[in-house]
C-alpha cells in the first residue's frame, strides 16, 4: 500500500487537506507552532495545481499552467540561494551545473513522485507521463507558496532536497550537454553561452507552446539550435548541436580529450595575443567605488527607502568587480598604480552574486507578472518575462540607473568598450541585486526592481508588443469551430524597396479586420488585433 493511500479517494483522487497536513508535518512541522501563521489553507489553489489542460471543458476552466509558471520561478530562486550559501567557496560555474541537475526534468519527476503528487493529477483522455509530473511539481510549489509564503516554501524545498537528493552524486554527475557547453565557455574564458528563446504555438497541439532555442558564442554567432516542448529540453538540444559544431562531440560521442584541446587552443591564443598586443596596465583610472550614500541615493531615486540596516560595502564592491579586475600574482612594474586614487584590485569577482541576482530577478518579475496579468496564460507570461529579464533590458536599466559607471573593469576591457558590453553591464546589475538581497532582504529588492522597471521601461507597451493576436485569432477560430483564419492582400502600395501592404482577415467571405503596415506579417497582426478587440468588446 502506498504511504499516501489514506490521503486520496480512488474514485476521483482529488488533492485534500489531510494530504497537505501530512506534508506540513513531514517537512515543516514548525509551521504549526508559528503564532503568526495563516489560519486556513486554500485548497482550491492546490486543486488547480493538479488540473492538466486535458480537463478543460469550458473556456473559464482553470489548469495548472499559471501555477507551474510561478512555481518554476520560486523553485529556481530558492535552489539558487541554497546552493550559494551551502557551497560558499565554489565558483559560479560549479553552482550553475549543480542547479541545472536539480532542475532537470527527470529530477523534478522524481521529486513529484517522492511527494506522491502522481496520486492527485487530474487528466482526461491521456496517460500520465513524465512531462506532466515535471509540470505538476512546479505547480504544486506555486500553490504552496501562495498558501504558506516564502519563509515556509523555502524551508519546505530545502528539506525536500536534503531528504531525497544525493548532492554528492549530482556533483559527480556530468552527462548534461548544457553543463558541458558551459564548461567549454569557461575554459575558453568566453563567459556564458547566450540562449535566445522563441515561443511558438505547437501546430500539432494549439494548447501547448513549442520552444525554439538558439545558443550564441561571444561573437554573436549562432552555434546551435534546438526545438522541443519545454525550454529546458530545447536548450539541451541547442547545446548538443553547439558541442558538435565545436568539435567536443564527434560522431555522436563526447571526445574525452576535449579539455586538453581547449587548453591547447587557449595557449596558442595567449601567445598570439602577447605578440600582437602592446602591454597595458590592468589598473583603470576610470574605476570608482560605490559609497553608502551612493547606494542610498540610487535606491531613493527609485522610491526605495532603506530600512535601518548597515550597508555592507565589501559585498557591494564584490558585486561591482568584473573578473578582469582581480588581484593577480607577480604583477609587472608597468602594472603598479601611479596614483593612490586608483581603485586597487579586488579579491572576489561578481560572478557568484550574478548567479544569485539573476534568480532573484527571475522570481520578482515572474511573481509580478503572475499577479498583474491574472487572466493571461503561462505562454504569454513566459514570453513577457523573457523580454523584461533579458540581457538587453538589464543592460538598459544598469545604464539608466548609472550602476554601469561603478563596474570595476581592467583598463584593457575599458578600451575595448567594456562599459557598453551588454553581458558585463547587465551582469553588474544582476550582481547588485544579489548583494542588495543578501544585505537588506527580498522586500527592498522587490520594491527597487519593480520601481526601476516601472520608471525606465514601458511595461505596458512591451506587453502590448508581446501579444500575438494571430495566435489569439487562431484559438478563437478553433474554439468556435470556424475553420482556419484567411488573410488576403487587399492592396500593395509604393516602390519595391518601401512597400506598404494592406491585409484583410476573413471569416468565410466576411471581412473581419484590416491592417496596414510595411510588411505582410505586421499588417496581419494589426488586422487580427482589430478583429479580436471587436470580438471581445461585443
Curated annotation (Swiss-Prot):
PROSITE patterns hit by this protein: DS_RBD, RNASE_3_1, RNASE_3_2
Catalysis performed (reactions): Endonucleolytic cleavage to 5'-phosphomonoester
Family designation: Belongs to the ribonuclease III family.
Residue span, RNase III domain: 24-149, 238-381
Name by which UniProt lists this protein: Probable ribonuclease 3
Role played: Digests double-stranded RNA.
PANTHER family noted in UniProt: RIBONUCLEASE 3, RIBONUCLEASE III
GO biological process: one example: rRNA processing
Pfam families assigned to the protein according to its UniProt record, in alphabetical order: dsrm, Ribonucleas_3_3, Ribonuclease_3
UniProt entry tagged with the keyword Lipoprotein: no
Domain DRBM: 408-477
Organism, scientific name: Acanthamoeba polyphaga mimivirus
One of the record's GO molecular function terms: ribonuclease III activity
InterPro entries recorded: dsRBD_dom, RNase_III, RNase_III_dom, RNase_III_sf
Keywords, sorted A to Z: Endonuclease, Hydrolase, Nuclease, Repeat, RNA-binding
EC numbers on record: 3.1.26.3
Keyword Ion transport in annotation: no
Amino acid at each position: 500500500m502506498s504511504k499516501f493511500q489514506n490521503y486520496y479517494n480512488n474514485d476521483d483522487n482529488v488533492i485534500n487537506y489531510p494530504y497537505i497536513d501530512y506534508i506540513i508535518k513531514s517537512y515543516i512541522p514548525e509551521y504549526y507552532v508559528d503564532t503568526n501563521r495563516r489560519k486556513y489553507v486554500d485548497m482550491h489553489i492546490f486543486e488547480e495545481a493538479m488540473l492538466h489542460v486535458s480537463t478543460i471543458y469550458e473556456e473559464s476552466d482553470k489548469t495548472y499552467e499559471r501555477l507551474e509558471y510561478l512555481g518554476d520561478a520560486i523553485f529556481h530562486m530558492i535552489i539558487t540561494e541554497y546552493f550559494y550559501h551551502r557551497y560558499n567557496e565554489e565558483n559560479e560555474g560549479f553552482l550553475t551545473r549543480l542547479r541545472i541537475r536539480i532542475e532537470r526534468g527527470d529530477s523534478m519527476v522524481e521529486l513529484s513522485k517522492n511527494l506522491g503528487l502522481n496520486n492527485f493529477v487530474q487528466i482526461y483522455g491521456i496517460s500520465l507521463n513524465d512531462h506532466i509530473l515535471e509540470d505538476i511539481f512546479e505547480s504544486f510549489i506555486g500553490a504552496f507558496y501562495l498558501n504558506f509564503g516564502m519563509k515556509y516554501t523555502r524551508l519546505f524545498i530545502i528539506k525536500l532536497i536534503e531528504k531525497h537528493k544525493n548532492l554528492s552524486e549530482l556533483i559527480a554527475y556530468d552527462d548534461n550537454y548544457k553543463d558541458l557547453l558551459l564548461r567549454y565557455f569557461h575554459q575558453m574564458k568566453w563567459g556564458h553561452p547566450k540562449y535566445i528563446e522563441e515561443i511558438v504555438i505547437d501546430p500539432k497541439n494549439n494548447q501547448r507552446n513549442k520552444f525554439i532555442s538558439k545558443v550564441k558564442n561571444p561573437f554573436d554567432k549562432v552555434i546551435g539550435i534546438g526545438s522541443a516542448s519545454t525550454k529546458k529540453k530545447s536548450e539541451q538540444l541547442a547545446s548538443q548541436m553547439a558541442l558538435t559544431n565545436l568539435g567536443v562531440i564527434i560522431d555522436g560521442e563526447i571526445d574525452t580529450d576535449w579539455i586538453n584541446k581547449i587548453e591547447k587552443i587557449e595557449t596558442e591564443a595567449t601567445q598570439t595575443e602577447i605578440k600582437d598586443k602592446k602591454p597595458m596596465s590592468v589598473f583603470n583610472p576610470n574605476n570608482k567605488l560605490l559609497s553608502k550614500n551612493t547606494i542610498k541615493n540610487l535606491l531613493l531615486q527609485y522610491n526605495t527607502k532603506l530600512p535601518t540596516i548597515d550597508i555592507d560595502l565589501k559585498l557591494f564592491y564584490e558585486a561591482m568587480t568584473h573578473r578582469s579586475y582581480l588581484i593577480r600574482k607577480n604583477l609587472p612594474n608597468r602594472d603598479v598604480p601611479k596614483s593612490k586614487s586608483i581603485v586597487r584590485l579586488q579579491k572576489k569577482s561578481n560572478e557568484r552574486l550574478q548567479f544569485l541576482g539573476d534568480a532573484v530577478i527571475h522570481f520578482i518579475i515572474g511573481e509580478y507578472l503572475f499577479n498583474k496579468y491574472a487572466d493571461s496564460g503561462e505562454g504569454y507570461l513566459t514570453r513577457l518575462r523573457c523580454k523584461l529579464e533579458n540581457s538587453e533590458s538589464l543592460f538598459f536599466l544598469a545604464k539608466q540607473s548609472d550602476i554601469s559607471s561603478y563596474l570595476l573593469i581592467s583598463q584593457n576591457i575599458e578600451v575595448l568598450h567594456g562599459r557598453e558590453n551588454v553581458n558585463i553591464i547587465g551582469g553588474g546589475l544582476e550582481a547588485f541585486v544579489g548583494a542588495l538581497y543578501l544585505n537588506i532582504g527580498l522586500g527592498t529588492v522587490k520594491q527597487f526592481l519593480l520601481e526601476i522597471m516601472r520608471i525606465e521601461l514601458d511595461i505596458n507597451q512591451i506587453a502590448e508588443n508581446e501579444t500575438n493576436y494571430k495566435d489569439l485569432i487562431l484559438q478563437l477560430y478553433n474554439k468556435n469551430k470556424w475553420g482556419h483564419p484567411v488573410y488576403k492582400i487587399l492592396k500593395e502600395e509604393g516602390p519595391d524597396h518601401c512597400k506598404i501592404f494592406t491585409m484583410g482577415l476573413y471569416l468565410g467571405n466576411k471581412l473581419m479586420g484590416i491592417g496596414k503596415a510595411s510588411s505582410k506579417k505586421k499588417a496581419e497582426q494589426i488586422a487580427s488585433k482589430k478583429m479580436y478587440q471587436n470580438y471581445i468588446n461585443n
